[in-house]
From Swiss-Prot:
EC number annotated for this UniProt entry: 2.1.1.182
PROSITE patterns: RRNA_A_DIMETH (PS01131), SAM_RNA_A_N6_MT (PS51689)
Major enzyme class: transferase
Primary location group: cytoplasm
High-level lineage: Bacteria, Bacillati, Bacillota, Bacilli, Bacillales
Signal sequence range: none
Molecular function terms, GO-annotated: 16S rRNA (adenine(1518)-N(6)/adenine(1519)-N(6))-dimethyltransferase activity; RNA binding
Cell location: Cytoplasm
Record's protein name: Ribosomal RNA small subunit methyltransferase A
Organism per entry: Bacillus cytotoxicus (strain DSM 22905 / CIP 110041 / 391-98 / NVH 391-98)
Gene Ontology CC terms, in alphabetical order: cytosol
Family: Belongs to the class I-like SAM-binding methyltransferase superfamily. rRNA adenine N(6)-methyltransferase family. RsmA subfamily.
Function: Specifically dimethylates two adjacent adenosines (A1518 and A1519) in the loop of a conserved hairpin near the 3'-end of 16S rRNA in the 30S particle. May play a critical role in biogenesis of 30S subunits.
């Protein structure tokens, strides 16, 4: 049987079921088998491994994962795709489709039901553009026992994930993702290999979970509050941003300035110039003065 991800087969499937693409669900189907195979290559899933997919569409990536993994679990929010997936994935008995919004699903429960204890599992997905960040954060914050992620996303978002301090793309998203994972941009995917064609190119990003976060922080929740406050207005200094936007800290500019100076951070610097290590040092220095 021909692979799903060819222009003709995709067209035939879509026409057979009278399927109309929903822009609100960010539906863009990949029609290039080479790209799909490279994505699966980067995930390095062995014959005993597992994969979690989000938004399988008509099953193009699911099919390639099913050929290599022992078990594939895919979350699909759109009920209209279920009969299509029943047909396209019929040759594979190692795939389970879950008709749920992954953001509302109990992913831990699904994980325990579907995978063996200690099984090597990767999240591999062409993520819908409009929910890329919430999905990544949900799966990272819930500490799902996966090795990592190989995910396709809007190139602009991928650039932000991998950004270094002092660059225009560096922000709270870069820090949050790099706190939990090692980030690598493994390929760029042109918009021309999708149906319908999106307005922008995509990136495939590999995120490998760190055994423990890259920096040690006393209070993780407060660390992220400090990071978010520091980027609240990019043109403002660290001093201004923290004094105006850090809600859990006393409105005391002198105290703030003294702490910054003591740890060797110039209060006139901007948030985007600080490394993740400097943010950890800063939040740890501010914690004792935090309002309870």
């Amino acid at each position: 049987m021909k692979d799903i991800a060819t222009p003709n087969r995709t067209k035939d499937i879509v026409e057979k079921y009278g399927f109309s693409f929903k822009k609100s669900l960010g539906q863009n189907f990949l029609i290039d088998t080479n790209v799909l195979n490279r994505i699966v290559d980067y995930a390095e899933i062995g014959p005993k491994g597992g994969a979690i997919e989000i938004g399988p569409g008509i099953g193009a990536l699911t099919e390639q994962l099913a050929k290599r993994a022992k078990k594939v679990v895919a979350f699909e929010i759109d009920q209209r795709l279920l009969p299509i997936l029943d047909e396209t994935l019929a040759p594979y008995d190692n795939v389970t489709i879950i008709n749920k919004d992954v953001l509302k699903a109990n992913v831990h429960e699904v994980f325990q039901e579907q995978f063996e204890e200690g099984q090597d599992v990767m999240v591999v997905a062409n993520l819908p553009y409009y929910v890329t960040t919430p999905i990544l954060f949900k799966l990272l914050e819930e500490k799902l026992p996966v090795r990592g992620f190989v995910v396709m996303m809007q190139k602009e978002v991928g650039d932000r994930l991998a950004a270094k301090p002092g660059t225009k793309d560096y922000g709270s998203l870069s820090i949050a993702i790099q706190y939990y994972t090692e980030v690598e941009t493994v390929m760029t995917v042109p918009r021309t290999v999708f149906v319908p064609q999106p307005n922008v190119d995509s990136s495939v990003i590999r995120l490998l979970k760190r055994p423990k976060p890259i920096v040690e922080v006393i209070d993780e929740k407060f660390f992220f509050e400090v990071v978010r406050a520091s980027f609240a207005q990019r043109r403002k200094t660290l001093m201004n941003n923290l004094s105006n936007n850090l809600n859990d800290f006393p409105k005391d500019k002198e105290l703030l300035e003294r702490i910054l100076t003591e740890i060797g951070i110039d209060p006139k610097r901007r948030g985007e110039t600080l490394s993740i290590e400097e943010f950890a040092m800063l939040s740890n220095a501010l914690v004792p003065h935090k309002m309870k």
